[in-house]
């Protein structure tokens, strides 16, 4: 029987670094998480995962089966380095090839959702042409994802092009494809001048997962829970009232901390306490 509890996951970069997924999933299970989100960022080491052998892919599937901790989503931030909106045709082609490989990887190992970074370009100056190329790249990507039955979900970003659910919904309407949905980050959403509760309501029916982190205006990473501007309780209440029953993912970057597991456990307890106040989970 499927659990009726809210699925709570942890970002890979919150846990100790390394390539042994069996160890990582065992630790996540010990810490009480239902799933781990994989990172494929712009580093060569994590990009290399998209070229894993059949045996390496099977090892991940086996680790999921052995531990019962799922890997249902991938945070694909590699497009910072190889953006779909790049005016350099070779760079853009690499970005599309990364997308193709990521979708194939997801299909092979059972990942259901690939979270996309909403950057037309990141290290270059954006303009009308980069935005046009980005839209066309998304269209091509969603066509590939549709054939593979893998969902592409746009993150709400630390970048003006995609810093609200309203803006991401514009792309959803443009693409008009059920395999393109939204993956908001309540931290990023709160760090901008957004009516956060209205934005979450606007995304109703399109949100497939939610990133949970704290932020401050202009500071989008490594803000300890409770020290930023995010009204977690109200966000959780709004999502619950909108009918959202999907997964929540605690996003942290504690893999290089002295004791990552302790940092994660502290964050887990803090987030679950706010969820309990919002009536989503039972109080500990």
From Swiss-Prot:
The keyword Phosphoprotein does not apply. One of its GO terms (biological process) is L-ascorbic acid catabolic process. This is L-ribulose-5-phosphate 3-epimerase UlaE. It comes from Salmonella paratyphi A (strain AKU_12601). Induction: Induced by L-ascorbate. Repressed by UlaR. Pathway: Cofactor degradation; L-ascorbate degradation; D-xylulose 5-phosphate from L-ascorbate: step 3/4. One of its GO terms (molecular function) is intramolecular oxidoreductase activity, interconverting aldoses and ketoses. The keyword Transmembrane does not apply. Catalyzes the isomerization of L-xylulose-5-phosphate to L-ribulose-5-phosphate. Is involved in the anaerobic L-ascorbate utilization. The lineage of its organism: Bacteria, Pseudomonadati, Pseudomonadota, Gammaproteobacteria, Enterobacterales. Keywords: Isomerase. Its EC number is 5.1.3.22. Belongs to the L-ribulose-5-phosphate 3-epimerase family. Coiled coil: none annotated. It catalyses: L-ribulose 5-phosphate = L-xylulose 5-phosphate. Pfam families: AP_endonuc_2 (PF01261).
């Amino acid at each position: 029987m499927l659990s009726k509890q809210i699925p709570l996951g942890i970002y890979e970069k919150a846990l100790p670094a390394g390539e042994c997924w069996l160890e990582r999933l065992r630790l996540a299970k010990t810490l009480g998480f239902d799933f781990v989100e994989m990172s494929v960022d712009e580093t060569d080491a994590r990009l290399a995962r998209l070229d894993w052998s059949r045996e390496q892919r099977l090892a991940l599937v086996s680790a999921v089966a052995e531990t019962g901790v799922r890997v249902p989503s991938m945070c694909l931030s590699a497009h910072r380095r190889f953006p779909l909106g790049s005016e350099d045709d070779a760079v853009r082609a690499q970005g599309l090839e990364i997308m193709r490989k990521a979708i194939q990887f997801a299909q092979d190992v059972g990942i259901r959702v690939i979270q996309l970074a909403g950057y037309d370009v990141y290290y270059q100056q954006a303009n009308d042409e980069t935005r046009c190329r980005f839209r066309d790249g998304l269209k091509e990507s969603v066509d590939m994802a549709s054939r593979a039955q893998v969902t592409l979900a746009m993150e709400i970003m630390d970048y003006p092009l995609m810093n609200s659910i309203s803006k991401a919904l514009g792309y959803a309407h443009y693409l008009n494809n059920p395999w393109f949905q939204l993956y908001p980050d309540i931290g990023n959403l709160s760090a901008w001048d957004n009516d956060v509760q209205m934005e979450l309501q606007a995304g109703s029916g399109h949100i497939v997962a939610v990133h949970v982190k704290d932020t401050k205006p202009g500071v989008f990473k490594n803000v300890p829970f409770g020290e930023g501007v995010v009204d977690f309780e109200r966000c959780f209440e709004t999502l619950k009232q909108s009918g959202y029953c999907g997964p929540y993912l605690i996003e942290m970057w504690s893999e290089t901390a002295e004791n990552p597991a302790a940092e994660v456990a502290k964050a887990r307890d803090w987030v679950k306490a706010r969820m309990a106040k919002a009536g989503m989970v039972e109080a500990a």
